[in-house]
């Protein structure tokens, strides 16, 4: 039924259509009836106040909206500019304060660093002076003994002698060293340790006499007798056994004759000749 009503409404000719009042009045006389399904169709006329009221209002709003913005825009930049200036001034003031605080902190840190550097330099100077003061003593030799680490032929200053002495000629240290216990024994000469014998010169004299004995046999009997008498008169001279055995008979005869003894003893002899057991050949020939 509803579809039929819609079809009837659409098939309405344009010449026969009248006002709604007229259609309503002539509804009983064969006119078309109003459809309930489309109530806004009859309201869409040229004289309807809905479109007339809304259209100019929409246009007025569209025209007045930019005008309102145009009135508000010139005032807003002034306010923003003043607030911006105030904000910039505040930022500049804060920047100045921050800069001053940062500068003060930098100055304080620089002063602390310089003070710490000065303290460190002063401490290092004191340490250098303290460490250098005992090292200066090492240049003065305390002990006169030569150092085993020093080379041969170097000179050392001796405080006792007040002169430079070679390291080889220095006496050994009186304090024994554990590393050099046997150096004095090794360096000591064996000649100094052995005492000279008392019989040394006597043995040497006897050896010299025995060496010269073969020459006496060719000098004659008188030379041998005089030498034997001189040896017997001298208690420090030892007579060899060979001469005593070979000339025992001649020595006995010479001792028994007092004339020969007196002649040998009374003859004038120089001190040098008396000291020597030998008599020159000239004196024997003159006798």
From Swiss-Prot:
GO biological process: mitotic G2/M transition checkpoint; positive regulation of cell growth; positive regulation of proteasomal ubiquitin-dependent protein catabolic process
Top-rank taxon: Eukaryota
Chain positions found as Phosphoserine: 35, 37, 45, 48, 62, 76, 143, 147, 187, 189, 267, 270, 276
Disulfide-bond pairs as recorded: none
Maturation and modification: CHEK1-mediated phosphorylation at Ser-37 negatively regulates its ability to inhibit serine/threonine-protein phosphatase 2A (PP2A) activity. Phosphorylation leads to its release from the PP2A complex and its sequestration by 14-3-3 proteins in the cytoplasm resulting in its inability to translocate to the nucleus, where it otherwise inhibits PP2A.
Ranges annotated as biased composition (Polar residues): 259-270
Region (Disordered) residue spans: 1-44, 167-189, 236-287
Composition-biased stretches (Gly residues): 15-32
InterPro entries: PBIR1/2/3
Modified residue annotations for Phosphothreonine: 47, 149
Protein name (Swiss-Prot/TrEMBL): PPP2R1A-PPP2R2A-interacting phosphatase regulator 1
Native organism: Homo sapiens
Gene encoding the protein: PABIR1
